[in-house]
Amino acid sequence: MQDGLLKMPVSLGLKAYRALVRRNLPTQYVPSQDRPEGEVLWIHAPEKGNALALFDLAKRLCAQRHGLSVLITSNEALVSPCATIIIDAAPSEHPQDTKAFLEHWQPNVALWLWGELQPNLILAAHRKGVPLIMADAGQQGFENRRERWLPEVARDVMACFQNVLARTEPAHARLAKLMRSDVSLELCGPLMAGGQSLNYAQSDFDDLSTTLGGRPVWLAASVQSN
């Protein structure tokens, strides 16, 4: 629903939320570094403890698309594993900070993980024409006080996403009740680290491939004899 929020009236709850946010002082957002040349994919990962899977996803995306840089914003202190992955803090919800963040990074696509919505930041990205996708959406990511007492805020904000991928059946059921029916919602598995291929000598790989000759190989790992 790319333009849905722009064409539909905003709920009273969302208007009230945005008015309250404007009363706070901006934090004067300062980016962690200059924007790199080329395309930038922004991943926001508010859930803690999933850094390995997050970095694995970012590395795979960079490997598949030449010149791509991945910007990761998170609620925990992360250290970038390589030059193409950029770590930064997400801006506050004040309009001045969200504007500074988006004008600096100019993301080509945004991938929001888990939940814990930042309505002003998501709305600002949507209105700038940034394609938004939510993946690995978890039930706990939509269980804070605002979602319970002002479900219309989440309903308006979720309309900004083109696709929403839930990690579990309970999360899918929760989002189905929370979201508008015209937003794409699918059930997928959780985001997990898949592991990256280790460096190897091409000559060794060629020799092993020739020896195997296409025969199936059975690998038994971490097993013990009885």
Q: Which role fits each region the language model picked out?
A:
Residues 36, 103-106, 211-214:
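Glycine-rich phosphate-binding loop signature in dinucleotide/nucleotide-binding domains
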Residues 28-29, 39-195, 200, 224:
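Active-site and donor-binding regions of nucleotide-sugar-utilizing enzymes
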Residues 27-31, 197-213:
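A short helix/loop element that forms part of the nucleotide-sugar donor recognition site in Leloir-type
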Residues 5-12, 171, 201-204:
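Alpha-helical structural motif
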Residues 19, 156, 208-211:
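Residues that form generic nucleotide/phosphate-binding pockets
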Residues 41-45, 209-225:
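Conserved donor-binding/catalytic core segment of Leloir-type glycosyltransferases
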Residues 1-37:
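Positively charged, low-complexity intrinsically disordered leader regions
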